[in-house]
Each structure stands twice: as structure tokens, then as C-alpha cells.
Amino acid sequence: MLFVYNCNPAVTMPDQNRVLRGLAREDLFTVVFDQVLTDSARWADVVLPATTFLEQYDLAKSYGSVNLQLVQPAIEAVADARSNVEVFTELAQRLGIEVSSSFATDPEALMHITDAMPDAIRHSLLQGGIATPPIPTCPVQFVDVFPGTPDRKIDFFPKSLDAEAPMGLYAFQSDPASESYPLVLLSPATDKTITSTLGELRQELATLQMHPDDAVARSLNTGDIALIFNELGEVQCPITVNANMKRGTIGLPKGLWKKSTMNGSTANALVQDTLTDLGAGACFNDARVQVTRMATVNLKDQSLSFRTGTSASKLVH
């Protein structure tokens, strides 16, 4: 059984085609607990509605901020939508797992968490909705805030990390690019989505960004349909020639849903499932690919017109 929550693995995980084959297994019972019908939810046997931040309690801290904020629901939960706390508490109870009664609902869980806080912070948070830690409100690096090293300096060569890295912290590694797959594929964040969140709102096709020199070498122009591929899969989408791109590097936004490309694959279909040497994270920006032209598209209405010598059958899989 697979229970998916706070995640959209069909489009956010490396080696996308392999992930989709796994989701398609007949012996896998999948439950997706989400706010919208994501690409992952389309593979689910059961879809459970989750609350949004407008319907639940939470504790939040934004990037770059030291303040803790209390999030309170603006509306009642819509229809049958439930929060993570409610769903997992009931799941645990049904599985016979003992759960503290203080975690039965969002407000109770919130009170349990704040009980462990210093009185001043707890009072400020519950009464005013925001808590400021007992440090200067505008900390300045190397004036009143320092790295946690013995000498309070930045350590560029920590011995513990050097020992943990299989090849050493700063060992040279050759570029994995090859003659068959010479281009670096990056999948940067955009102002359209937060990873894959809000991906359902994107109406237009995503475009591949490529430097003019790389485009000329492949007889590509803005508006052409590009086939981006390697040994793992392929992605089909329009191209935009962009002089701001680095030569040898192409870009396709991260967080895309299947509807944002012409064949339903995203950049993660070209990313291997190898792990980083430190932290065991995914290597999302380590893919090497090749790009060829397939057709021409009007980027305003996104209608296709195939160029001489390009077979429409190439778009059918």
C-alpha cells in the first residue's frame, strides 16, 4: 500500500518513467490525500480531500524570518476535507497504535506543542499570533550573530564532511557529459509554481530555454518543438532561444505537471535516481541530454505545423 500526502511523486521524483510504472502496478493499492486532483491522484485507488491553509491551524516561519507565526483557519473545512493531524490520528487509532489524546485535533496538537515553549513565547504566540525569539530582531552576520564553529568563522573545509564524502570534499570529478548527451539540463524554480504546487493553474505549455549557439548547432529556432532525450526518456515541448542561458546548458522549469509538455513527461523523466554523496539527496540538476527539432509551434495559440521532413508520427507514443 502507498499513502501519498504533501507530495506529488508522479512529477517530483527522479526517473519519472520508472515511478509511473511503479504507480501503475496492479498489486499496489494507492491512497492520495491532497487538496487538488494532482497527476499522482490520477493513479490512486482512493482520493481523500485535504484541508488548505485557509481551513486549518498551523505554525509557520517564512524563509529569512526568525519570527514564529500562528496560522488560524479563515473558514470551516470544506465538505469532507480533513487535516493531516485528524487523518493520521484516526489512521493510527484504527491500526491499534496508541495515540495521545492531546493530538486528536489541530487545536489540541497546537496546544501540546506550545506547552513546551517558554512562557513568554507561548503567550505572545497564542495572544498576538506571532512570537519573536529572545535575540536581536535584526541580527547582523558577524556583528551579533556568528557561525557555530569554535573560532566563530566560516569553515570551508570541515574535517567531518571531508571524511564523509566518498571522494573527499573537494575532489575533482569529470563532467558526465558524453558525445551522445552533451547538454546539461537544469530545472530551475519559477514564479508560476512552488515545486509542483499550483501546477494545475498553468495553462500554457512550458518552453525549453537554450543559448543561441546551441540552437544554431541544432538548427533550432524559437517556436520549434524540441525533443529532449537521454537513455531514461524524452520530453517534447516548444523552445525559446535565450541569450541569457549559458552555452551547453538548457533549462526546463521544475514542478511541471504532465499537461505542461506535449508528451506528458517532465524534466524529471531525464533525471537518474542516483543520490548525492553528502546528504543522500536527489541529483535533480545532474542530467545530461541531447536536443533535436521535431516541429514548429505558434507560441501564441500553440498550434502545430510540421516542417518538411518531420513526421507527425514522432509525436505519437
Give residue ranges: language-model regions.
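Short acidic, glycine-rich surface-loop motifs adjacent to enzyme active sites
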Residues: M1-V11
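Generic beta-strand/beta-sheet core signal
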Residues: V4-N6, V31-D34, P49-T51, F157, ...
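Glycine/threonine-rich flexible loop motifs
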Residues: P9-R18, D58, S62-S65
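Phosphate/diphosphate-binding loops
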Residues: V19, R25-F29, F33-V36, P73-Q93, ...
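Flexible glycine/proline-rich, aromatic-decorated loop/lid segments
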Residues: L37-V71
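Long, contiguous, secondary-structure-rich segments that constitute the structural scaffold
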Residues: V78, S83-G129, S196-Q209, D213-H317
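Long, low-complexity segments enriched in small/aliphatic residues
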Residues: A109-E200
